[in-house]
Amino acid sequence: MPVHLPAHSRRRFLAHLAGGVVAIHGAAQLSAAEAEGEKWVLFSDTHVAADRMKEARGVNMAANLERAVKAALAKGQGVKGVFVNGDCAFNTGEAEDYATFTGLIDPLRQSGLPVHLTLGNHDHRENIRKGLKEAGDKKTVVTDKQVSIVEGKAANWFLLDTLELVNKTPGLLGEAQLAWLQKELDARTDKPAIVMMHHNPDVKEKPTGLKDTAKLWEVLAPRKQVKALFYGHSHTWTVEQHESGIHQINLPAVAYVFNQAMTNGWVEVSLAAKQMTLRLHAFRVDFADNGKDKVLTWRS
């Protein structure tokens, strides 16, 4: 049951295809030059509560999401869509949390931007449907998991579901989802693949991130079309590279930080044929990476 919130306007809409695939309308008609400037907005860990005045760790989560939405809208017409990478809700994923979340992101949809969601450990599969009311096809291609593919011109985005137990820290993909991912990657070798999931890779004996990280890399590493892996969960901004050459990007939280040396904020992504450019929009304006471009070249 992929969770996609279509744009309200007719400027851009989504074509829902079989098997959890979503195509951005008009992407196939983009010229190579237009594809070079394909931009996306990435949010993670918004942790919105039903009460817009709710605070955690000294932060009003609703106000932070509102701030991120306004900044993203200021980017103009070049943005193709928005991804929210899990932990959309505050704690246990109540339906009322998602109702508030929907209201906060509605200006994006009003402006013509579709919004694509993944689930984190503070989300709830049933309640997200109740709270969002309109979130795409309810059919599942992997039992009890939300998976989907967003097909852009410059890259395909593979959205995974790492939610194992609500309000329990670690995450899990599971064998069925890994098999789905392998199959869908093998069917799409014509353009770069970007994988997105909520939980961070974690190979510790007692992981707090993704429990089946090693199995995920067995799928991703040998498939050369896979160029980048985005995740959140740790409320940390880092850009690293796996030994396979796949770029690993830990998205900052829109909500709050666990470490005061870190920043919250959001990330702007610009795709090209052989590279991706990241720009961090930090809420801490004095943060070292704020506003700076990081150019990541695709592995060959």
Predicted regions and their residues:
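A short C-terminal boundary segment appended to hydrolase-like catalytic domains
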Residues: E34, V267-S300
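Short, solvent-exposed loop/turn elements at domain surfaces
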Residues: V48-K54, V166-N167, V257-N259, A288-D289
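Active-site glycine-centered loops adjacent to acidic/histidine catalytic or metal-binding residues
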Residues: D45, G86-D87, G120-N121, H198, ...
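N-terminal secretory signal peptides and thylakoid transit peptides that target proteins
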Residues: P2-H25
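Short acidic, glycine-rich surface-loop motifs adjacent to enzyme active sites
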Residues: R188-K204
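Extended active-site neighborhood of metal-dependent phosphoesterases/phosphodiesterases
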Residues: E94-K183, A187-R188, P192, D212-Q225, ...
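N-terminal active-site segment of His-dependent metallophosphoesterases
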Residues: A32-Y98
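Histidine-centered catalytic micro-motifs
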Residues: M196-N200, K227-W237
